[in-house]
Amino acid sequence: MEKQIKYHTPEQALIKIRDWCAYQERCQQEARDKLYDYGLKTDDVENIIAQLVNENFINEERFAIAFAGGKFRIKKWGKVKIKQELKAKRVSDYCIKKGLAIIDNTDYINT
């Protein structure tokens, strides 16, 4: 079954993506993929991503910390799997290190 593309203007997409990012932490790549699903062109997508970062709707470091903490506590993922998933989402190495740093070594060993 083919994915149906919903076409939005950049203004409509910005409103929708703000709500989507406010609901839970998102990385830039997730937001970028969602904007392309809205049928936007590359220039519009990159402008909206820049605006979301400036407005602090998207923060890669905050995302990495939330992602790593959640996957470790809830899904019991190890650091290697968390790192692989963050890399797949194109999160920077700096942010990945920040995210993994919140996992307590004592808790990690006991898992």
Give, region by region, the residue ranges found by the protein language model.
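An alpha-helical, amphipathic repeat domain used for nucleic-acid recognition
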Residues: 1-111
